[in-house]
Amino acid sequence: MVVVNAENAVVGRLASYVAKLALSGEEITVVNAEKAIMTGNKEYIFQKYVQLRTRKSISNPKKMGPKYPRRPDDIVRRVIRGMLPYKKPRGVEAFKKIKIEVGVPEGVSIDINLGSAPNTIKYVTVGELSQFLGAKF
């Protein structure tokens, strides 16, 4: 089992790395999901996720999909799923091998640290985005 630290890691780069490991057969745990970062304008990122969450259908608003998550671990899981062929059996098996954690559980030693100091001032953490969307974690 490989433990990946997501602190200060760009979400897309983290997701592609984790997806490639999962497709090769590794079991992966991603810790500190709330500290991963999304680069770009903060207002634009917030506006994009609010727009995705508030989409409704005229015929039946409760059944309109796709449903977008609020919690940081689920947001990161959704981004990783986008890097996998999740509609095929190979992608389903790879997606089952990925676990996402908020914080670091007790007794877990970190194997891979993908984060570095952000080299831009335009970024938002997944935790800030989750709190803006109304998550309680």
Swiss-Prot record:
HAMAP family: Ribosomal_uL13. Signal peptide: none annotated. It comes from Methanococcus maripaludis (strain DSM 14266 / JCM 13030 / NBRC 101832 / S2 / LL). Belongs to the universal ribosomal protein uL13 family. Keywords: Ribonucleoprotein, Ribosomal protein. The keyword Ribonucleoprotein applies. Coiled coil: none annotated. GO terms for biological process: negative regulation of translation; translation. This is Large ribosomal subunit protein uL13. PANTHER family: LARGE RIBOSOMAL SUBUNIT PROTEIN UL13, RIBOSOMAL PROTEIN L13. The keyword Ribosomal protein applies. It holds the Pfam family Ribosomal_L13. Part of the 50S ribosomal subunit. One of its GO terms (molecular function) is structural constituent of ribosome. One of its GO terms (cellular component) is cytosolic large ribosomal subunit. This protein is one of the early assembly proteins of the 50S ribosomal subunit, although it is not seen to bind rRNA by itself. It is important during the early stages of 50S assembly.
